[in-house]
Curated annotation (Swiss-Prot):
GO terms for biological process: D-amino acid catabolic process. Keywords: Cytoplasm, Hydrolase, RNA-binding, tRNA-binding. A Gly-cisPro motif from one monomer fits into the active site of the other monomer to allow specific chiral rejection of L-amino acids. This is D-aminoacyl-tRNA deacylase. It is found in: Cytoplasm. The lineage of its organism: Bacteria, Bacillati, Bacillota, Bacilli, Lactobacillales. It comes from the Bacteria.
Length: 145
């Protein structure tokens, strides 16, 4: 499982010009699920993200978590995060989990975040989406589990 975590001032995801998810200040999560991922990875990722202190306090130190700042999450499924680029010029996605299992696991991940008291908006699994965001920092972390 790979999650790209971006601290944002705001973010939105659109499909065919219609906004399907948007947040003010918070985290944009780009979520890639690999073959072999399961509940263990989903729970660990949700725990880590819910507790991660990546927002600045009054002194400018990254001491605050998403709940401390009243932030929200926009979760977007992105299988291309599992691209293998070692050979040739065309990325291979053989390590990415296939639907419908990947769709179900992504939904479970989002529910685990909600269970931890977070407000979660989402894109639409498998759709061609346009993601708009304003990075804060920028502050981006890649979480591999």
């Amino acid at each position: 499982m790979r999650v790209v975590i971006q601290r944002v001032n705001h973010a939105a995801v659109r499909i065919d010009g219609e906004t399907v998810g948007q947040i003010p200040k918070g985290l944009l999560l780009l979520v890639g699920l690999a073959e072999g991922d399961g509940e263990e990875q989903v729970v660990k990722a949700a725990d880590k993200i819910a507790k991660m202190r990546i927002f600045e306090d009054e002194a400018g130190k990254t001491n605050l978590g998403i709940k401390d700042v009243g932030g929200q999450i926009l979760s977007v499924s992105q299988f291309t995060l599992l691209a293998d680029t070692k050979r040739g010029n065309r990325p291979s996605f053989v390590h990415a989990m296939r639907p419908p299992k990947s769709s179900q696991l992504w939904e479970e991940f989002n529910q685990e975040l909600v269970k931890r008291g977070l407000t979660v908006e989402t894109g639409e699994f498998g759709a061609d989406m346009k993601v708009e965001l304003e990075n804060d920092g920028p502050f981006t972390i890649v979480l591999d589990l």
